[in-house]
Amino acid sequence: MIGRLNHVAIAVPDLEAASAQYANALGAKVGAPQDEPDHGVTVVFIELPNTKIELLEPLGEASPIKAFLEKNPAGGIHHVCYEVADILAARDHLKAEGARVLGDGNPKTGAHGKPVLFLHPKD
């Protein structure tokens, strides 16, 4: 069921500074910031040869990333994204195995126009 690693998402307190660090110090290809209001974040994708890193900064006071950064002021890994062939079948299988799907359980549209779901971090 699990496919390739799509990206590792890192919450950061300063998106501009983190982007500059990846571009200048590490020579990475850093994309332009894009607001994702449905998810309460501004994101920047960093292209790597085998996957991507997604930097996340809060967008608005209700952002889940704002709450994450309040608990982890320096930032840190927020989630790992895997690709699956059928997101609804994967959701149903994981729920049957006891995983908790966050939100209303239905996919939202992610940063690249693909459907996404989030599982509880302890699952």
Each language-model region and where it sits:
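Helix-adjacent hinge/juxtasegments
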Residues: L55-V80
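Conserved acetyl-CoA-binding loop of GNAT-fold acetyltransferases
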Residues: N24-V30, G98-V101
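Vicinal oxygen chelate
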Residues: Q34, V44-E47, I53-E54, Y82, ...
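A short, acidic/glycine-rich surface segment
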Residues: G31-A32, A62-A67, G103
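N-terminal beta-strand motif that seeds the catalytic metal site of vicinal oxygen chelate
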Residues: M1-S19, G75-V84
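Short glycine/proline-centered loop/turn elements that form peptide/ligand docking sites
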Residues: A17, D35-H39
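Conserved active-site tyrosine of GNAT-family acetyltransferases
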Residues: A18-A23, L94
